[in-house]
Curated annotation (Swiss-Prot):
Pfam families attached to this UniProt entry: PGM_PMM_I, PGM_PMM_II, PGM_PMM_III, PGM_PMM_IV
Protein name: Phosphoglucosamine mutase
Enzyme Commission number(s): 5.4.2.10
Catalytic activity: alpha-D-glucosamine 1-phosphate = D-glucosamine 6-phosphate
Function field: Catalyzes the conversion of glucosamine-6-phosphate to glucosamine-1-phosphate.
């Protein structure tokens, strides 16, 4: 069955476009019914980021959940990993995060977590999808069995203590000047406070949300302001989170960006040296740079690749027993601590290494030189361009040219009629020629089918 609502990270779209109060109400009802297992009083934890539309969606979800007899615990603006943690810690049946992650304020979304804090499986999402398109009137709770809603105080302190406990008790960040960019998003209160409690000299930007400025020229997808601030303040490190704080990038003392691949390299190598890797491997997606794979191989660490999406990374980690994984975009999953990506916890592990080694971030975090990588998109109207003989031939020729010196990844988008062509290798010019050849072939095939 094709999925109409759920993508790779919950339901996401334009507020009052796809994401309407009516849809949120129905999601609350359907998810509430799907997770009413057992005879106990059922409850759901709901958090959100700082988008203007969060109020509208939150109220609609509350109406949906309470109408099927589920109690609602509202925690307000909180990082996605905090909502996952609270779902488990508060013995809830379900967790919900209202966020469109790194998107701008016009979009919003609904992420769902099971009782142990993990994102839902495809099968459970399909079960909920089926209910979204049917009438649930006959399944609503009786008047005396309706749910209640209440706001929970003190949740910021719970997450701060959780994050601090991922570091050794004796470790302090005293002496480190840290610039934190919270993307005007969900972490704007809790993360600067946690860094201060750990002893860092904290300079905060992206901590003045107004409902409209989440991820706007700030955060992990737009680190230019952070890079400039680190240089201006002569800071030791910059940390950039996205709107819901499940991804992170760092900036070294020179103002240079450290992406998710470099973070996987430094954490993977460090944890192997300390005997903390559950198995000699790290899980990443097909988009991670070949330079990461080569670096890890030199350290005796395998790189396992999954489809794009942090949920697939986590599935592989749980299936095969790995405890470090992530994406080049900055979703870092450390399953010793988290059930989902946690940008702040990942950053703390690197800060701990910087303190332990007494070396600048530029030396600690730049473990390999990324190979040149070129990504191009080809839009098409109809047909199956990847089945065209000219395209197949161009791909085969490209693979021969890159054999042993690079790789190709050609995949259709899951959300729009676009073919994504990615090539990387030791020689930039060769990679560009290979990618352009495939793009030209795809363009010809798309034009012929139009």
């Amino acid at each position: 069955m094709s999925r109409r609502y759920f993508g790779t990270d919950g339901i996401r779209g334009r507020a009052n476009g796809l994401i309407t109060p009516e849809l949120a109400l129905k999601v609350g009802q359907a998810a509430g019914l799907a997770f009413q297992r057992g005879e106990h009083r059922h409850r759901v934890v709901i958090g959100k980021d700082t988008r203007l539309s969060g109020y509208m969606i939150e109220n609609a979800l509350v109406a949906g959940f309470t109408s099927v007899g589920m109690d609602v615990l509202l925690v307000g603006p909180m990082p996605t990993p905090a909502v996952a943690m609270l779902t488990k810690s508060m013995r809830a049946d379900l967790g919900v995060m209202i966020s469109a992650s790194h998107n701008l304020f016009e979009d919003n979304g609904i992420k769902l977590f099971g009782p142990l804090g993990y994102k839902l499986s495809d099968d459970v999402e399909k079960q909920i999808e089926l209910m979204l398109d049917e009438s649930l009137d006959k399944k609503l709770a009786q008047s005396a069995s309706l749910g209640r809603a209440r706001r929970i105080d003190g949740v910021h302190d719970r997450y701060i203590e959780f994050a601090k406990r991922t570091l050794p008790r004796e470790l302090s960040l005293e002496g480190l000047r840290v610039v934190i960019d919270c993307a005007n998003g969900a972490a704007y209160k809790v993360v600067p406070e946690a860094l201060w409690e750990l002893g860092a000299d904290v300079i905060s930007i992206g901590v003045e949300p107004d409902g409209f400025n989440i991820n706007k020229e700030c955060g992990s997808t737009a680190p230019q302001a952070l890079c400039a601030k680190v240089r201006e303040m002569r800071a030791d490190i910059g940390i950039a989170l996205d709107g819901d704080a499940d991804r992170v990038i760092l900036v070294d003392e020179r103002g240079h960006v450290v992406d998710g691949d470099q973070l996987l390299a430094v954490i993977g190598q460090s944890w192997k040296e300390d005997g903390r890797l559950a198995k000699p491997g790290v899980v990443a997606t097909v988009m991670s740079n070949l330079g990461l794979e080569r670096f890890l191989a030199g350290e005796g660490i395998a790189l396992l690749r999954t489809p794009v999406g942090d949920r697939y990374v986590l599935e592989q980690m749980l299936k095969d027993g790995y405890n470090v994984g992530g994406e080049s975009s900055g979703h870092i999953i450390l399953s010793d601590f988290n059930t989902t990506g946690d940008g702040f916890v990942a950053a703390l592990q690197v800060l701990a290494m910087v303190q332990k080694l007494g070396r600048p971030v530029s030396e600690v975090c730049h473990r390999f030189d990324p190979l040149p990588q070129i990504l191009k998109n080809v839009r098409y109207r109809s047909g199956r361009p990847l089945d065209d003989s000219g395209v197949i031939s161009a791909i085969q020729d490209g693979e021969k040219r890159l054999n042993g010196h690079g790789r190709l990844l050609i995949r259709p988008s899951g959300t729009e009629p676009v073919i994504r062509v990615m090539g990387e290798g030791d020689d930039h010019d060769v990679v560009e020629e290979v990618v352009d050849s495939i793009v030209d072939a795809l363009g010809n095939a798309a034009a012929a089918a139009a």
